[in-house]
Amino acid sequence: MKTFAVSIAALFIWTACGDGNQPIIDREALVERNSPVVTAFDSLASLSVGNGEFAYTVDITGLQTFPDNYKKGVPLGTQSQWGWHSFANPDRLTPEETLKEYDFGRGKKELYATQFKEEGRQQDAANWFRVNPHRLHLGIVGFDVEEGTDIEQVTDVHQKLCLWDGKIESRFKLNGEDYQVETVCHPSNDMIAANITSKAHTGICFRFPYPTGAHCDDACNWEAVDKHTTTIVTQNESSAVLKHTLDSTEYFVTLCWEGKATLNEKAKHYFVLTPMDDHLAFTCAFTSTAPSTQPVTVAQTQEEAKNYWNSFWKEGAAVDFSACTDPRAKELERRVVLSQYLLAIQSAGTIPPQETGLTYNSWFGKFHLEMIWWHEAQFALWNRSNLLDRTLGWYEKVEPIARQIAQRQGFDGVRWMKMTDPRSE
């Protein structure tokens, strides 16, 4: 698989090479002039940081303060490649019960997983396996504003996604108080870091939802508070570990803060970190198992994110449209640059990406294998085959299951799944 990816990348590079006397592209200028800037609330203008395995999407406050205002736009997700959940299966429905024989005139009967219209156990099985497992929203991290505060009260907004350094800088006013927020994602951990300066001393809330199991939404059910638990496992004056348990699924959230602050439980699945000073820096890491490594500081996270994204843009291919006279060139360049960033944070993971990346759920958070060409083949074209290679190992892992599907349907070789999940169920 690795050799194949490298060969394809080399082919693209060779065919794309032009005159060696072309002027050198100023890559930083190219990237920076296409960094998105937001100056007012727009439910379609949320911004994200991520690393391919994890992504965190923010509103105009640089955190996830007003998620309800973005639900019908681009929701404020916190998603990972490992964060999945299944509802209970008390009837012990099995994948075999979803199969139906079809005759396509090839001289044999072929078994396919089917969405049954007739009521009964087969329909129940098809419905259950369609929904389960589904991808989790790992938690809302935002300012703990007073109840009744509206997003329209946020004024003087200037927010920039600094693509070159991989950070979001947000400045705004709320109730007359100035706020400055810097948000980054660690390049190799499922963790965000934030630097906040404000005399308002507004707390940071950490809220944890139960999943909806819906086809396409933000995956947040805030009503089912008794169906899951969130507890503080350990806590000291500068850190805490939370454990979120949903049926048979559990994961951990490690909070570390710099500066005087207190962490308290405000309600079920609702915790608030309240700063005592004008400056608060914190990290929030999500893990599928109890944390066992030394926490990474905010400064370390910022530095590693900067180094990663600087290297990302300095390496691989680049295209500069600034000398083009066609009026469409500026917009085309913007899309070319921004799509590279979005696909790197949303689609460069150890499993194929869902159609909406790691922002919100579509098709229950599952992924469609016919779509991987659109999401990931471009990595080879841009000479970033290392990002493509992250996913190829998954194909090797599930190849035995794909071979069983082919055998079940009377074919040689393998038949890849269409809509599936990490375990290929």
Describe each PLM feature range:
Residues 1, 191, 276, 371, ...:
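Detector for methionine-enriched segments
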Residues 15-16:
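C-terminal motif of bacterial Sec signal peptides marking the signal peptidase cleavage site
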Residues 20-366, 384-388, 395-405:
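Acidic/polar, glycine-enriched structural segments that form the non-catalytic walls/loops
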Residues 356-366, 411-425:
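Carbohydrate-binding/catalytic loop surfaces
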Residues 361-377:
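Extended hydrophobic/aromatic segments used for targeting, binding, or gating
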Residues 372-417:
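Carboxylate/His-rich catalytic cores and anion/metal-binding grooves
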